[in-house]
């Protein structure tokens, strides 16, 4: 049935404060009556037995004549009043909406008066039997009714609704009440997380939980949030990645592990970045980065089919194909492909790339930047946004991949990939560096970069080096940004659209 707008024709055009005052007056009347009857103003004894969407599905193929010609089907529903026209109402629960038919001849006068006084947003319980209108709409013929929660603030209506984007983010609860599209987005998010968890569990991965506060920030190149532990009198860092702890677990014998949890990076906010975000990280012993590319293809294709029913996923004006295999190309070749004036010699020439970075890209080149760092900058600035269809970029420079295993044929690159869709990085994975001596040297190089002014360079983690010295089996690991993946599946333009409560600048009180 067509879903009515959140709109009332019975309420006069009053200010919000006037409407709130009216509702408080109604609550006072309810409280006064409750004192006489001994009933609770906020009852909590009703037990719902049916959901709106389940009833719509159950009776979708049963016409009016069949419903009226058979034994009555009695139901008990509950939800928020979204429309009240006197003779019928519409309530909304977590699954959808259903009409309630108000039989003026069959209900007591005081019940009819209470129904008439209901405001949009009130939460009610209803009992009755199923019927179908002449227009074909399914309804519950009301026989019993109870007000469960009195709403003291008016809902946005059709013309003055919750259209301000910032208001949607600040008052997500209200956005969820009035916008079906918003509810659908977060249902998709839940399906994505559940689908990933089920896929990996079926592959014999074990879900684990690792610390959210770290003594040393590690596992990624980013600025951390800093806090203080009063009892231990020491600085701690909100984690930027769980990687080093998860690899410790592989050392300990848990050969397939994953964690779905929050990471925190004290960096900028944009349509693609939020300082607090959700990641899935997983590690598999006796596998390499190519195995994880295959796993990623299989998992994303299954998610698309299970959630959307297709591997052709619309996003804005584009359609992304989640049907594997996905394109795979090295960073070196991708730079050449998208910079036709470059030669292979140019891409391997530090001085050429430094001049291009400064003069064309207008990016600062610090003295410590090596060839790999400059290649990465050129790739990020000239290639990334052009990677529209699902694409694996492979063979990242060792200089910018301090935790990845060096390639056997070329020690200047690593067995690493990043995965892109719509010009955005969604995943990062690689064959893990399990040589503790090489890892220690790379940590030392990162410390030198940090001392030279690179705030995102990594710290030296002696405990992790000690763990590697006990022996990490050949392992591959990967992280996928849940928020960005949900953006694609939900066709959401901003990362804030897929976060229930995104961080906002504090308003003046």
UniProtKB/Swiss-Prot annotation:
Q: What GO terms fall under cellular component here?
A: cytosol
Please give the cofactor(s) recorded in the UniProt entry for this protein.
Mg(2+)
Q: Which residues bind Mg(2+) 2?
A: 425
* UniProt-annotated binding residues for Mg(2+) 1: 418, 425
The GO biological-process annotations, alphabetized, read as:
lysyl-tRNA aminoacylation
The EC number on file is: 6.1.1.6
Q: Enzyme group, top EC level?
A: ligase
The superkingdom listed in its UniProt entry is Bacteria
- What InterPro entries does the record tag this protein with? Aa-tRNA-synt_II (IPR004364), aa-tRNA-synth_II (IPR006195), aa-tRNA-synth_II/BPL/LPL (IPR045864), Lys-tRNA-ligase_II (IPR002313), Lys-tRNA-ligase_II_N (IPR044136), Lys-tRNA-synth_II_C (IPR018149), NA-bd_OB-fold (IPR012340), NA-bd_OB_tRNA (IPR004365)
Reactions listed under catalytic activity: tRNA(Lys) + L-lysine + ATP = L-lysyl-tRNA(Lys) + AMP + diphosphate
Which UniProt keywords are present, listed alphabetically? Aminoacyl-tRNA synthetase, ATP-binding, Cytoplasm, Ligase, Magnesium, Metal-binding, Nucleotide-binding, Protein biosynthesis
Matching entries from SUPFAM superfamilies are given as: Class II aaRS and biotin synthetases, Nucleic acid-binding proteins
Recall the GO molecular function terms of this protein's record. Answer: ATP binding; lysine-tRNA ligase activity; magnesium ion binding; tRNA binding
Pfam families per UniProt:
tRNA-synt_2 (PF00152), tRNA_anti-codon (PF01336)
Cofactor: record remark? Binds 3 Mg(2+) ions per subunit.
Kindly list the places in or outside the cell where this protein is found, as annotated in its UniProt entry.
Cytoplasm
**Primary site of residence:** cytoplasm
Give the CDD domains listed for this entry.
LysRS_core, LysRS_N
> Which NCBIfam families does its entry note?
lysS_bact, PRK00484.1
Quaternary assembly:
Homodimer.
Family membership: Belongs to the class-II aminoacyl-tRNA synthetase family.
What is the protein's name according to its record?
Lysine--tRNA ligase
Q: What is the lineage of its organism?
A: Bacteria, Pseudomonadati, Pseudomonadota, Gammaproteobacteria, Moraxellales
